[in-house]
Every structure is written in C-alpha cells, then in structure tokens.
Curated annotation (Swiss-Prot):
Function of the molecule: Involved in the synthesis of autoinducer 2 (AI-2) which is secreted by bacteria and is used to communicate both the cell density and the metabolic potential of the environment. The regulation of gene expression in response to changes in cell density is called quorum sensing. Catalyzes the transformation of S-ribosylhomocysteine (RHC) to homocysteine (HC) and 4,5-dihydroxy-2,3-pentadione (DPD).
Requisite cofactors: Fe cation
Organism: Klebsiella pneumoniae (strain 342)
Chain residues that bind Fe cation: H54, H58, C128
Subunit field text: Homodimer.
Gene name in the database record: luxS
Name listed for the protein in its UniProt record: S-ribosylhomocysteine lyase
Length: 171
C-alpha cells in the first residue's frame, strides 16, 4: 500500500489550531488543486466530540465558501478527518496559508452567530445520513476554542518525518 502524504508528517510536533498545505497537484487540464489540513486539535491530546464535529461539518462548508471563494479560489470539499482532530479542505487554486487562516477564523465567528439548531443547513432525514447526531452547543465550543487560541501555520518541512524514522516504523 502506498504511503499517503498525511502520514509522512510528525503528528507529535503539530500545532493546533493550524493550517498546513497537505498536498498540491494539477489536473490534466492544468487546474491547480490544493488540499489543506485544517488542524483543530493537537493530535493524540485532543479530539472534537462527534456531534459537534458533525454540526460543524454542516456549518463550516458554507461559511468557509463565503470567506474564501473568489480571486482564483473555489472550494471543492471540506470533510472531517476520521481521527476527529481536524478537517481536510480541497480547493481549486493556491491561496496562501494566512488567507486560509483568516477565512477559517471568520467562519468560526459565523458559527458563533447561529442562534439555534434549526439554522443548521441540511439538518433533515433527506439530506443528512445521521440527522439526529448534532449539537450546536458543541460546534460553538469548538469555534470558540479556535478563536481563543488563534490559527497558526504548520510547515511541512518542520514536520517531515525523517526517512530513518519511517524505516524504523516499517513504512
């Protein structure tokens, strides 16, 4: 099995909240695709609650588009990580990390403005696979956590696992 890019960085040294360019690629037609690691929690120390991350998934996708789309950038998808420590965001374009961080903070401020659960988009049996598993309160706690701690930038060069370590891990 090939070694995925996300497993070549040292999770013990990641800061959170932080933005990291996880991958860059070009389509056959020359479009630039960038995948960002939006790390909400320090790996192996913190985790987002499942109801909160699910609600945030519904809110974050729209709010990030409001703040980041345009000027050569269009978000393709924002999806939670299985480890519940962050989200991956795939987009067309190559915005710098600070632009992404600023949009992320603005999106979190928008999450705090949501007044009740009925304002969560697609919160129904037809558009959500687990529509009863939501918590606006938990999503807003996560948003407050991001705003209070601010968003930093994680560098791939600083986080790269040395080849010796990868060999030691039998990868």
């Amino acid at each position: 099995m090939p070694l995925l890019d996300s497993f070549t960085v040292d999770h013990t040294r990641m800061e959170a909240p932080a933005v990291r360019v996880a991958k860059k690629m070009n389509t056959p037609h020359g479009d630039e695709i960038t995948v960002f690691d939006l790390r909400f929690c320090v790996p192996n120390q913190e985790v987002m609650p499942e109801r909160g991350i699910h609600t945030l998934e519904h809110l974050f996708a729209g709010f990030m588009r409001d703040h980041l789309n345009g000027n050569g950038v269009e978000i393709i998808d924002i999806s939670p990580m299985g480890c519940r420590t962050g989200f991956y965001m795939s987009l067309i374009g190559t915005p710098d990390e600070q632009r992404v961080a600023d949009a992320w903070k603005a999106a979190m401020a928008d999450v705090l403005k949501v007044k009740d659960q009925n304002q969560i988009p697609e919160l129904n049996v037809y558009q959500c696979g687990t529509y009863t598993m939501h918590s606006l309160e938990e999503a807003q706690d996560i948003a407050r956590h991001i705003i209070e701690r601010d968003v930093r930038i994680n560098s791939n060069d600083e986080l790269a696992l040395p080849k010796e370590k990868l060999q030691e891990l039998h990868i």
